[in-house]
Amino acid sequence: MNFTTEELEHLCFVTRVDLNGTKSTLEDTKHYIKVCKKRKEEQWLINEHTSFRDHLKIRVKKEQALLTKLENQFISQGGTFE
């Protein structure tokens, strides 16, 4: 797909915001798993959060790769981040 410089800049911004939110959720989930283990919560609850954590790790990698591609395309089209 071809995007204008303005569209790419906006896509980078939106993707960065989404990535930051996902990273924050990932850190919160990691912390919650530790708390659950200390409290000796039921194993199914820990397993559910562990599965969610693993999903978030994959999502962070995908979003980071997308952001890198968008930023590279933006820069190659002569865009600059302010």
Named regions from a protein language model:
Residues L19-L26, H49-G78:
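Amphipathic alpha-helical coiled-coil segments
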Residues T22-S24, V35-I46, G79-F81:
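Charged, low-complexity interaction regions
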Residues F3, K34, K38, A65-L67:
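Glycine-centered signal
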Residues M1-K34, I75-S76:
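N-terminal acidic leader/helix
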